[in-house]
C-alpha cells in the first residue's frame, strides 16, 4: 500500500507539473535563440578564440576584437566568421527554447494556489533548475561548437581539417572520447546555470518593479524599448558575476590542451595569467551577449504573447 501511495503521489505531482507546460514558450524561445545567434555568431567566435588564448604556439595571436575579425576574414572569408554556426544555432535555439519551456512550467507550478508572488530566491532556484535540465540535453552541442570554432587551419577543403561539420564532430568525439567527451565542461556548465538564474531573477524583478513604478499591472506587457532595457541590465549583471566559469569551460572543451579537470584549469590559468586570465574575452562577450540577449528576449516575449493569445482565443 505504501509503495502504491508513493507511486500515486508521484504521478500526481508529475501530472500537476505537466499541466503548466506551454509549448508556446518552447517555440518562442527557439525563435529568439536562433535569430539572435545567426545575427551575432562572429562575435561568439571571437569570444571563444580569446577565452582559450593561453600562449600556445599553434594559436593565432590577436591584438583585439577588430584584429581578430579581420584576420579570420582574410584567411577564411565569411565562412570563417561563421565557423561552428550550425551547432551554435542548434544549441542556442534548443537551449533557449527548453530554458523558457522548463522555467515557465516550474514557475507556474510553484505559484499554483498561492496569492502572493514568487520571492527573488524562488525565481533564482526555478531558473537554476531549468538551466540544469536544459544543460543535460544540450551539452554535447556546446562541445561540438567549441571544437569547430577552434580549428585554426579552417581553409575550405583543407586536408588538415579535423572536423568536417556538426555531425562529423559529434560522431568523432563519441568514437574517440565516448560519452565523457560529449559532456566535457558539464561541471562548470552546471555552475554556469547560476548565470541564467541570476539573469532571470534580475529580469523578473526589474519587470515587476518597473511596472509598479509606473502604476501598471505586474504582468503588463512592456514595449520593445522597455524589454530591451530590462534585458540588457539583467544580462550585464549576470555576466559580471559569472564570466570566469565560461573561460574554464571553454578551456576544458578545447582539443588542443589537456586538463585533468576543473581544478587543474583554474590552477594553471591562475599561475600563468592571474585574475586577468579568467576574464579573457569579456569585452567581445559583453558586446555580443547584451544585444543577443535583447534580441532573444524581445522575440520571445512578443512571440509567446502572440501564441498564448491565440490559445486563449481558441478556447
Curated annotation (Swiss-Prot):
It is found in: Mitochondrion inner membrane. Keywords: Membrane, Mitochondrion, Mitochondrion inner membrane, Repeat, Transmembrane, Transmembrane helix, Transport. The chain crosses the membrane at residues 26-43, 89-106, 123-143, 186-203, 227-243, 281-300. One of its GO terms (biological process) is mitochondrial FAD transmembrane transport. It is a multi-pass membrane protein. The keyword Isomerase does not apply. Solcar repeats lie at residues 20-109, 118-209, 222-306. It catalyses: FAD(in) = FAD(out). GO terms for cellular component: mitochondrial inner membrane. The keyword Membrane applies. Its main location: mitochondrion. One of its GO terms (molecular function) is FAD transmembrane transporter activity. InterPro entries: Mit_carrier, Mitochondrial_sb/sol_carrier, Mt_carrier_dom_sf, SLC25A32-like. Facilitates flavin adenine dinucleotide (FAD) translocation across the mitochondrial inner membrane into the mitochondrial matrix where it acts as a redox cofactor to assist flavoenzyme activities in fundamental metabolic processes including fatty acid beta-oxidation, amino acid and choline metabolism as well as mitochondrial electron transportation. In particular, provides FAD to DLD dehydrogenase of the glycine cleavage system, part of mitochondrial one-carbon metabolic pathway involved in neural tube closure in early embryogenesis. Belongs to the mitochondrial carrier (TC 2.A.29) family. This is Solute carrier family 25 member 32. It comes from Macaca fascicularis.
